[in-house]
Structure formats: C-alpha cells, structure tokens
C-alpha cells in the first residue's frame, strides 16, 4: 500500500491520506 510519510492524527482510516490506516497510536501509518 502507498502511504505518504506525513505525521497525521486520526480517529479513523478515512482521516488518513492515500492508503494509510489509523494506527493504535492515534496516528496514520
């Protein structure tokens, strides 16, 4: 999957860019 390495806070996968997923840490990855 393609995930830009940009630190983004999230509550759901939809908060993240591209194919990033929301990790347990509360950040996209």
From Swiss-Prot:
<keyword id="KW-0646">Protease inhibitor</keyword>
<comment type="function">
    <text>Strongly inhibits trypsin, weakly inhibits chymotrypsin.</text>
</comment>
<dbReference type="GO" id="GO:0005576">
    <property type="term" value="C:extracellular region"/>
</dbReference>
<comment type="similarity">
    <text>Belongs to the protease inhibitor I7 (squash-type serine protease inhibitor) family.</text>
</comment>
<dbReference type="Pfam" id="PF00299">
    <property type="entry name" value="Squash"/>
</dbReference>
<dbReference type="InterPro" id="IPR000737">
    <property type="entry name" value="Prot_inh_squash"/>
</dbReference>
<feature type="disulfide bond">
    <location>
        <begin position="16"/>
        <end position="28"/>
    </location>
</feature>
<keyword id="KW-0960">Knottin</keyword>
<keyword id="KW-0722">Serine protease inhibitor</keyword>
<keyword id="KW-1015">Disulfide bond</keyword>
<dbReference type="InterPro" id="IPR011052">
    <property type="entry name" value="Proteinase_amylase_inhib_sf"/>
</dbReference>
<keyword id="KW-0964">Secreted</keyword>
<feature type="disulfide bond">
    <location>
        <begin position="10"/>
        <end position="22"/>
    </location>
</feature>
<feature type="disulfide bond">
    <location>
        <begin position="3"/>
        <end position="20"/>
    </location>
</feature>
<feature type="site" description="Reactive bond">
    <location>
        <begin position="5"/>
        <end position="6"/>
    </location>
</feature>
<dbReference type="GO" id="GO:0004867">
    <property type="term" value="F:serine-type endopeptidase inhibitor activity"/>
</dbReference>
<protein>
    <recommendedName>
        <fullName>Trypsin inhibitor 5</fullName>
    </recommendedName>
</protein>
């Amino acid at each position: 999957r393609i995930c830009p390495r940009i630190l983004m806070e999230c509550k759901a996968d939809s908060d993240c860019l591209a194919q990033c997923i929301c990790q347990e840490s509360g950040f996209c990855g």
